[in-house]
Amino acid sequence: MGLLQGLLRVRKLLLVVCVPLLLLPLPVLHPSSEASCAYVLIVTAVYWVSEAVPLGAAALVPAFLYPFFGVLRSNEVAAEYFKNTTLLLVGVICVAAAVEKWNLHKRIALRMVLMAGAKPGMLLLCFMCCTTLLSMWLSNTSTTAMVMPIVEAVLQELVSAEDEQLVAGNSNTEEAEPISLDVKNSQPSLELIFVNEESNADLTTLMHNENLNGVPSITNPIKTANQHQGKKQHPSQEKPQVLTPSPRKQKLNRKYRSHHDQMICKCLSLSISYSATIGGLTTIIGTSTSLIFLEHFNNQYPAAEVVNFGTWFLFSFPISLIMLVVSWFWMHWLFLGCNFKETCSLSKKKKTKREQLSEKRIQEEYEKLGDISYPEMVTGFFFILMTVLWFTREPGFVPGWDSFFEKKGYRTDATVSVFLGFLLFLIPAKKPCFGKKNDGENQEHSLGTEPIITWKDFQKTMPWEIVILVGGGYALASGSKSSGLSTWIGNQMLSLSSLPPWAVTLLACILVSIVTEFVSNPATITIFLPILCSLSETLHINPLYTLIPVTMCISFAVMLPVGNPPNAIVFSYGHCQIKDMVKAGLGVNVIGLVIVMVAINTWGVSLFHLDTYPAWARVSNITDQA
């Protein structure tokens, strides 16, 4: 028993050492480029799947093994780690950092909640719409971490009252008391502590528990007091921090007034994770999965100019919209029942006392933000401007602004995002007051030299691990192509040629949907993209017909807490159990799979010309064989 425990403690080290040694006969006994490339690919994939080393570190394996085995030169491998998509991500993160710093996302979220009211059905729809909207532009993890504190505050208001009469009798007392997490109370609730931007606590540093599949297991989200109380700040600079009791105390102390209250908490919590996933599908920059697909596709088929921000949005927006509505019905039916008339009524006469109190609390939180600030207006303007420039660069149906330049093809979506992101480092955060003196303010503050975002803000938000991970995927794909491994894999799949194209795509989608529940999304798509490209070329199927649905289905890792970080964040709040996630997530998975398959076979065909085998795929196939 002691030996077994010792092996379990060092299992990661054993994997790191034993896997390369056990696979070493492959390139030694078969000294070919294909075998050497397969060796590197398998070692890297095992490291990714097992989490024996961090995902970013495992992505560096091709950087030294490819040159060592003579698959690619060192400078060729290095070039794969920084691509056009990396610059696109840099620019987007600059805008995202500004949104998070000045709490523009919170203003949008609270405003939408105020519009919906406190009826469970409308509240569910509102939070799902809000999360989807934010997740289009911010990472799914960041969006979930931003919205969940607001959801938790609303939930605690909904479950803290015993009944209407009790709330009515003690309304003055309840309004005077702050929401706290005093363990002595019979009903623990959420405490919102606002910490200024200089606080060192952030989601990354707090997710320090043992990782499962690259997803941190959160047992105690952000729990930091303001260390800089002497510095006065605009309310929009404050960040909502959440204190939750430990899982054991949650089990003992969290009580729901009724089964209905418990179902509301489960429903709202899970819906945040699902709607973040749905929103991430909508834009090409919504998830790292889409970015990896875009860069791999552009590298594999450089002559194909069919996928950009505009075309992806035109295809995916109807999918997200339909998924959002159907998922709302599914979650409502599963947890709240079919009484839509009662739970979705907007009539003020039908609102209970505690629903009115909840709305009042949300109104108070919104009023704390004050009037919209100058940095918020600048950030919102840049946000809208970036989206408009992306859409109008090459809309497809009319000439875009890129056609005004003499040289074509030099500008991409990354050009726009990096330019606007660069400007955010220059524009002052304080509105210029020309010809006016700011008496009573210190000289540094009155000069207004602090920009909208600083490099420190950018560093806190930039996901460098994803950048290296994506680069490792490009390196693997490049090695597979140059060594001929992709062609060999494609030839082994000729047995699938008897199946119709839609069946091949469906099987691929089901396969990745299962794998991605246990393997991280970036690792899954990085492994499958080269294989599916070879499969499509071998079967003479338009590669987009397979790649786009698979890319979307990889994002549907919604059944387990380890599926993706949003699931882990939601699960950490303690409202739902794994069986709840599996039951609800299975329905969302099926909904997404059906809608994606319908979309790719209807408007996807006309948008991407999927009914023909394109010339750019033939050119790539000839190049691989050569």
UniProtKB/Swiss-Prot annotation:
InterPro entries: SLC13A/DASS. It is found in: Membrane. The chain crosses the membrane at residues 13-33, 52-72, 77-97, 113-133, 274-294, 309-329, 372-392, 414-434, 466-486, 499-519, 543-563, 590-610. The keyword Cell cycle does not apply. Transport is inhibited by thiosulfate, phosphate, molybdate, selenate and tungstate. Not inhibited by oxalate, citrate, succinate, phenol red or 4,4'-diisothiocyanostilbene-2,2'-disulfonic acid (DIDS). It is a multi-pass membrane protein. Highly expressed in placenta and testis with intermediate levels in brain and lower levels in heart, thymus and liver. One of its GO terms (biological process) is transmembrane transport. GO terms for molecular function: sodium:sulfate symporter activity; transmembrane transporter activity. Sodium:sulfate symporter that mediates sulfate reabsorption in the high endothelial venules (HEV). This is Solute carrier family 13 member 4. The lineage of its organism: Eukaryota, Metazoa, Chordata, Craniata, Vertebrata.
